[in-house]
From Swiss-Prot:
Pfam families in UniProt: CAP18_C, Cathelicidins
Primary localization: secreted
GO biological process: antimicrobial humoral immune response mediated by antimicrobial peptide; defense response to Gram-negative bacterium; defense response to Gram-positive bacterium; innate immune response
Superkingdom: Eukaryota
UniProt GO cellular component terms: extracellular space
Protein localization: Secreted
Keywords: Amidation, Antibiotic, Antimicrobial, Disulfide bond, Secreted, Signal
Name of this chain's protein: Cathelicidin-7
Family according to the record: Belongs to the cathelicidin family.
Disulfide bonds: 86-97, 108-125
Gene coding for it: CATHL7
């Protein structure tokens, strides 16, 4: 009788452990911070990229406010990466690579899960024009603006001359 009770108790305990195992996510997945999840996404970007060099996190936009925290829920992310001097084939982690002077900068957006399972992300990265191009564009606009203002001044002087008579 005692053996039956012990066996029944052991069976019930096993059932509870089994149910608990189904409810709690497996140990192969990890609960990551927002930053860690983004760093993993950058690693995956580098693995899937056909670019010659590795990219490294340049700037991490703040995480959006979430009402309810569900570890498995997809979280929107936004960050910027920059090309490094390390070739993509290097075993060195991107965090140990220096940024390439005038390297490409990419703005990345997408979703990741904080409860990380390998490859569970959806990120798109697009080139951002380098600061040099923006500077040249700004300077061209200023020069064009100055030319327009100079022509408007000349037209104004001609109109004054017409009314003077």
């Amino acid at each position: 009788m005692e053996t039956q009770r012990a066996s029944f108790s052991l069976g019930r305990s096993s059932l509870w452990l089994l149910l608990l195992g189904l409810v709690v996510p497996s140990a192969s997945a990890q609960d990551l911070s927002y930053r860690e999840a983004v760093l993993r996404a950058v690693d995956q970007f580098n693995e899937r990229s056909s670019e010659a060099n590795l990219y490294r996190l340049l700037e991490l936009d703040p995480p959006p406010e979430q009402d309810v925290e569900h570890p498995g829920a997809r979280k929107p992310v936004s960050f910027t990466v920059k090309e490094t001097v390390c070739p993509r084939t290097t075993p060195q982690p991107p965090e140990q690579c220096d940024f390439k002077e005038n390297g490409l900068v990419k703005q990345c957006v997408g979703t990741v899960t904080r409860y990380w399972i390998r490859g569970d992300f959806d990120i798109t990265c697009n080139n951002i024009q380098s600061a040099g191009l923006f500077r040249r564009l700004r300077d061209s606009i200023r020069r064009g603006q100055q030319k327009i203002l100079e022509k408007a001044r000349r037209i104004g002087e001609r109109i004054k001359d017409i009314f003077r008579g």
